[in-house]
Amino acid sequence: MRKFAKISAVLAAMVLALAFAGCKSDDDDDDVSGSTLGVSGAEKAYWISVKEKKGEVGVKYAKSYIEFTSDTTAKCYKYYDQDDVNIKKEAPSVGYFLDTEVTFKTSGNSLTATDVKFSEYKNGAWVYENFNDSPDLTSWSLTYTISGSEMTEVFEYTSKGESGTETTKYIKVTEKPTAPYKK
């Protein structure tokens, strides 16, 4: 009898942990919608970038987040710390600033960027440019795939004869970030 009570307690703890983590199986992929993205209202959410480092326990939350403003548009924010401000001169002050604005087309649980505007702090002001107008970028694609409370970004590019792929993981949170944090 005690054996079954222990097993039940362990299973209950596992179910609670999975529910708390917002885990979903791959066959639970959601079609992209305002509620899935957390556009507004009771479902309002933010997507925090996740960076896992080998050999370190826990998950590190990187210095960026995405806020979807509609089913087909998003704003991406980047956190600038004191070194970014004083040494690198990348921002006017410490905090989050708009990094990119993205327009998407949607299909199932994927969003594919059709237009990307990025910002750069130059000579004391923010300058906005379009990916398509960049002389260094010959081709690019940016796709987000959503599975439950997780999202994967894949950015593929060709620039001056070099090409590459960058992948970033995100998790959905309900509080607007005020600074990078660790879990």
Sequence positions of predicted segments:
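Bacterial Sec-dependent N-terminal signal peptides
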Residues: 2-4, 16-45, 170-183
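Contiguous, well-ordered beta-strand patches that form the walls/edges
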Residues: 52-55, 75-152, 159, 171
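Low-complexity, Ser/Thr/Pro-rich intrinsically disordered segments found in N-terminal tails, propeptides
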Residues: 35, 45-50, 54-67
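Sec-dependent N-terminal signal peptides
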Residues: 6-13
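Signal peptide-directed secreted proteins
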Residues: 149, 153-183
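Intrinsically disordered, low-complexity serine/threonine-rich segments
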Residues: 11, 28, 36-38, 43, ...
